[in-house]
């Protein structure tokens, strides 16, 4: 092997892009491979808590995110019918003073575009769908659908819930359908809301379903909602299907007038299955390591799924900087030791869908700083 060890990141979602950006800034020889032909502004929003914004500071896009995003003063939880306040979690200025970074909501596509723009030229390659993986003691060979073959000494699987690299490590297994779907819609903020309580960030709760609503721009001219609604079956051959205003009316019949107004203002809505996996017995083997949904997919009910992938990427970069890449097995063990317990906790709480329904202390989540956490060894077995 000549020159620096080569790192290949498979999957340019939020976790993979963050990892490639951080590793490039740290001086590693990294390439990022994405199966899509290009990116578009997909219709979804995202929460970026202080735990993520501190990582964006390292990538160099914190200020622009703060300009583009919406900064809610509180996370509200409300009763589905009466609108009564169930919880009010301070964010806004409190997040800055207490956690050391902002809490914002933003359009997922805008966030992804900023991270992608932070990558060095030529690092990201599109139209790279992974079809086969060969490995020996010294190198991993990545075979793509376009006929190309790339080699790397380290391969990072950031390729999502249906990860090809997870399948290579552990065998083929479909993720679990949880019995819930998420309806998603992004659209211009209704102008005729009158006196209805359009909170900047609110989750409406009933016993068996919910709707999370927030602005995705600093101008508050675009609003997003995502639901959790029970649905007995899902065709696992489909990643999503169109929904409709009629389906939304039926799912949320009798809900508060604010929810009804949002439904009536919805031009288009899609429906997605909520998928999970049991915690994996391993996150790495040989020269391959997983991050994000490839190893711990979760329901979105804490708004922390992407955050966990980004934290994984930051921790892996931090450990590579500390240990170097020659003893990759030791680096991977240290990564699991310092990520598996937290990711599993977030996965459990997300599954239970109890997060911030009452006035609880979110410090363990929002106050986490991947760069300040003391590194520990041997904790993986306890996760």
Curated annotation (Swiss-Prot):
EC number(s) reported in the record: 1.14.13.114
Activity versus pH, per record: Optimum pH is around 7-8.
Co-factor(s): FAD
Active site per database record: 47 (proton acceptor), 214 (proton acceptor)
Substrates-to-products reaction catalysed: 6-hydroxynicotinate + NADH + O2 + 2 H(+) = 2,5-dihydroxypyridine + CO2 + NAD(+) + H2O
Listed GO biological process terms: catabolic process
Positions contributing to FAD binding: 15, 34-35, 47, 108, 130, 293, 306-307
Annotated signal sequence range: 1-26
Notes on activation and inhibition: Competitively inhibited by 6-hydroxynicotinaldehyde.
UniProt KW keywords: Aromatic hydrocarbons catabolism, FAD, Flavoprotein, Monooxygenase, NAD, Oxidoreductase, Signal
Class of enzymatic activity (EC top level): oxidoreductase
Gene Ontology molecular functions: 6-hydroxynicotinate 3-monooxygenase activity; FAD binding
Subunit record text: Monomer.
PANTHER family in the record: GERANYLGERANYL DIPHOSPHATE REDUCTASE (PTHR13789:SF318), MONOOXYGENASE (PTHR13789)
Function per UniProt: Flavin-dependent monooxygenase (FMO) that catalyzes the decarboxylative hydroxylation of 6-hydroxynicotinic acid (6-HNA) to 2,5-dihydroxypyridine (2,5-DHP) with concomitant oxidation of NADH, a step in the aerobic nicotinate degradation pathway. Is also active on the non-natural substrate 5-chloro-6-hydroxynicotinate, and is much less efficient on the substrate analog 4-hydroxybenzoate.
Protein name, as recorded: 6-hydroxynicotinate 3-monooxygenase
Organism: Bordetella bronchiseptica (strain ATCC BAA-588 / NCTC 13252 / RB50) (Alcaligenes bronchisepticus)
């Amino acid at each position: 092997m000549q020159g620096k060890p080569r790192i290949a990141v498979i999957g340019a979602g939020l976790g993979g892009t963050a990892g490639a950006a951080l590793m490039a800034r740290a001086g590693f020889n990294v390439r990022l491979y994405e199966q899509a032909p290009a990116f578009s502004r997909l219709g979804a929003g995202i929460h970026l808590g202080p735990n993520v914004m501190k990582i964006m500071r390292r990538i160099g896009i914190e200020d622009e995110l703060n300009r583009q995003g919406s900064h809610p003063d509180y996370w509200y939880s409300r009763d589905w019918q009466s609108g009564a306040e169930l919880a009010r979690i301070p964010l806004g200025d409190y997040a800055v003073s207490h956690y050391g970074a902002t809490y914002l909501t933003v359009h997922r596509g805008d966030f992804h575009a900023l991270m992608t723009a932070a990558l060095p030229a030529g690092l990201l390659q599109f139209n790279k769908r992974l079809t086969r993986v060969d490995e020996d003691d010294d190198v991993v060979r990545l075979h793509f659908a376009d006929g190309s073959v790339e080699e790397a000494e380290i391969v990072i699987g950031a390729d999502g819930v249906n990860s090809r690299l997870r399948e290579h490590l552990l065998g083929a297994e479909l993720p679990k359908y949880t019995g819930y779907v998420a309806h998603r819609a992004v659209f211009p903020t209704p102008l005729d809301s009158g006196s209805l309580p359009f909170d900047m960030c609110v989750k409406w709760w009933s016993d068996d379903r919910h709707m999370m609503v927030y602005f995705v721009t600093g101008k508050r001219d675009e609003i997003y909602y995502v639901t959790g609604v029970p649905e007995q079956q899902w065709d696992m051959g489909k990643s999503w299907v169109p929904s409709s205003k009629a389906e939304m009316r039926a799912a949320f019949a009798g809900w508060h007038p604010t929810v009804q107004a949002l439904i009536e203002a919805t031009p288009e809505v899609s429906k997605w299955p909520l998928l999970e996996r049991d915690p994996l017995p391993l996150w790495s083997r040989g020269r391959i390591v997983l991050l994000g949904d490839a190893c711990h997919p979760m329901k979105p009910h804490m708004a922390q799924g992407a955050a966990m992938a980004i934290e994984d990427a930051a921790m892996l970069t931090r450990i590579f900087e500390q240990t170097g890449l020659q003893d990759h097995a030791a680096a991977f063990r240290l990564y699991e030791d310092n990520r598996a317990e937290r990711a599993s906790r977030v996965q459990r709480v997300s599954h239970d869908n109890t997060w911030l329904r009452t006035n609880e202390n979110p410090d363990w989540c929002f106050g986490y700083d991947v760069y300040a956490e003391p590194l520990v060894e041997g904790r993986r077995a306890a996760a």
